[in-house]
Amino acid sequence: MMTTRRLVCSGFTALTALTALAALAVPASAQGLEKFPFRLNWTLYGEHAPFFVARDKGFYKEEGLDVEIAEGSGSTTVAQLVANQTSPVAYVDAATMMRGIGAGMPIRAVGVTLQQSPMSFIYRADAARPTKIEEIKGSRIAMTAGDASLAIFTAFMGKLGMSVDDVKLITVANPQSKEQAVLNKQADALLGYFMDQGPRMQLQTGVRMGWTRLTDLSGISTLSSAIIVNNAWVKEGKNADLLRRFLRASQRGWQYTFDNRDEAAEIFMKNAPAFNKEISLLEIDGTMTILRTKASEGKPLAWSAEQDWKDTQVLLETFAKLKPQADLSTYYTNEYLAEPPYLPKK
């Protein structure tokens, strides 16, 4: 709850306050900041907190950037926006990006934040299904149109000797409808992230929720969320430098979130009014468990290993009809990332 206090200022104090307010009113361009639009993969959830931490703690500003964070409507749609330069830098599911590249999209990952798949079946605890392999066939699974989870789910089903046709897919228009389908028992489960929908739905509705990670059922995992860019955009003018500054401040935001989760939750709440402290902290804590793989351990945040890209490609090629790339660097580069402690260059 916000309270307003009346301050009675006089003389120099009042003048100082007015000067500070005037400074806040100065547009970013007048402060020497460069606009940098950044589109998320989805509506806000705890995984996005580090980007707001980087913005609200002034990390982007210290890099000379005025970062505008916009919500997305699914990785498939957002990848297309990056490909046509409507949003030249964005945050999407890595597998979805790989499929886009196979279809000719001129896009590439420049940082991978989530390096293990959080994909899960999320269901009501009083109607838990599927919790084991034998329960998957015939289950009603809710999914949004353009959902990033489809590629991973297809590979998951193939690994288990099944296909997507073995479940009843219920396609809905938006994330809220997907959740309502499960809450109203029109679907048995939705495909989502274990650190997002399950805890939030339970805390917001009072309905006890459960979830089963796909990797626990099949043993498979893939690279997950990535910052991607348009290939032509990054070669234009000073865009490569802008990108380096953005990534350095973002890495700093992720590190700060890892080290200061309580404060990060407070910052995220201010930007996502639908979230309370408990939900924000739960989602942030879950996110922080899947930042690295064995191959990327000890490397800078968002640095990804060639072996992990290879493993992800083999899985998607084998079970989800991904068109493979002979050169794995078509998918990614680490060249724009910074080394710890991710501070601005003097």
Regions found by a protein language model. Give the residues of each.
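Surface-exposed patches in mature extracellular/periplasmic domains of secreted proteins
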Residues: 109, 169, 257-268, 325-328
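Secondary-structure end/capping motifs
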Residues: 237-319
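Pocket-lining segment of extracytoplasmic ligand-binding domains
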Residues: 95-96, 176-181, 186-274
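Sec/Tat signal peptide C-region and signal peptidase I cleavage site
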Residues: 21-30
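N-terminal export leaders
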Residues: 4-12
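Short, glycine-/small- and polar/acidic-enriched structural segments
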Residues: 30-184, 188-195, 211-215, 221
